[in-house]
């Protein structure tokens, strides 16, 4: 395991290739301001990476500050990327393509069904992202 980060160079650690990743990746992160809100706006973050790389667990994507300062609930999701998420083999039901987008859709459905238990308003949800995450937002509209 080679450490390819550059300590002291701002922003370099966020792309550290030594971040633990797994095919078992369908997880959500939920940040709630204290005290627990009632009917709060929900912001859902989708990370970028060209649909090839990325994870919501990078420190730069920590939603606790946004949740605390703006009194909103912040949710981020992981989804399959690369061949596991976007390989399409026409005629092969085991690789229909765009599985990463279906992972995102599943996360969005989960938020709609469960966010009220966290103090969120399922009718006040905003999607946002960068790069492939922003493209994903447009694909879900």
UniProtKB/Swiss-Prot annotation:
It comes from Macaca mulatta (Rhesus macaque). Substrate binds at residues 49-50. InterPro entries: AB_hydrolase_fold, AChE-related_enzymes, CarbesteraseB, Carboxylesterase_B_AS, Carboxylesterase_B_CS, Cholinesterase. Its main location: secreted. Glycans are attached at residue 39. It comes from the Eukaryota. Present in most cells except erythrocytes. GO terms for molecular function: acetylcholinesterase activity; cholinesterase activity. The active site is at residue 131. This is Cholinesterase. Its EC number is 3.1.1.8. Pfam families: COesterase. Belongs to the type-B carboxylesterase/lipase family. Keywords: Disulfide bond, Glycoprotein, Hydrolase, Phosphoprotein, Secreted, Serine esterase. Esterase with broad substrate specificity. Contributes to the inactivation of the neurotransmitter acetylcholine. Can degrade neurotoxic organophosphate esters. It is an enzyme of class 3 (hydrolase). Transmembrane segments: none annotated. Homotetramer; disulfide-linked. Dimer of dimers. GO terms for cellular component: extracellular region. The gene is BCHE.
